[in-house]
Amino acid sequence: MMSLLTPAVLLTQRSHTLTLSVSTPLGLVMTTYESSTLKDARLKLVSQKEVNGKLHLTLGAGRLLYIIRIFLATGTTQFLTMVLPSTASVDSLPGTYLRRC
């Protein structure tokens, strides 16, 4: 169940692109991320939380974590990629896999 306090989020993955749409107080914010590491990746939404006016999304595939921060007051986004240690994998974390379009 999603909290009514959390902004609505739509993630769409196609090949090596990820499209993010977020409903904020300023309106709809849409951003597209392209990365060769997203190609053929089976993305999993690991966490989604809102903290101090920022929406934090954590996605993962294999040993890669993709962290997306959306500043709700301005609509600005940040996209970070992290590599997990060789003994760790996103597959062992709880979460929901995204369906491909």
From Swiss-Prot:
Coiled coil: none
UniProt entry keywords in alphabetical sequence: Eukaryotic host gene expression shutoff by virus, Eukaryotic host transcription shutoff by virus, Host gene expression shutoff by virus, Host-virus interaction, Inhibition of host RNA polymerase II by virus
Record InterPro entries: Bunya_NSs
Top-level taxon of origin: Viruses
GO biological process: one example: symbiont-mediated suppression of host type I interferon-mediated signaling pathway
Reported function: Inhibits host transcriptional machinery, by producing modifications to the phosphorylation state of the C-terminal domain (CTD) of RNA polymerase II. Inhibits phosphorylation at serine 2 in the heptapeptide repeat (YSPTSPS) of the CTD of RNA polymerase II, suggesting that the elongation step of transcription and/or 3'-end processing is prevented. Inhibition of host transcription machinery leads to shut off of host cell protein synthesis and inhibition of the host innate immune response. NSs also seems to be involved in the nuclear relocalization of host PABP1.
Family, similarity comment: Belongs to the orthobunyavirus NS-S protein family.
Name used for this protein in its record: Non-structural protein NS-S
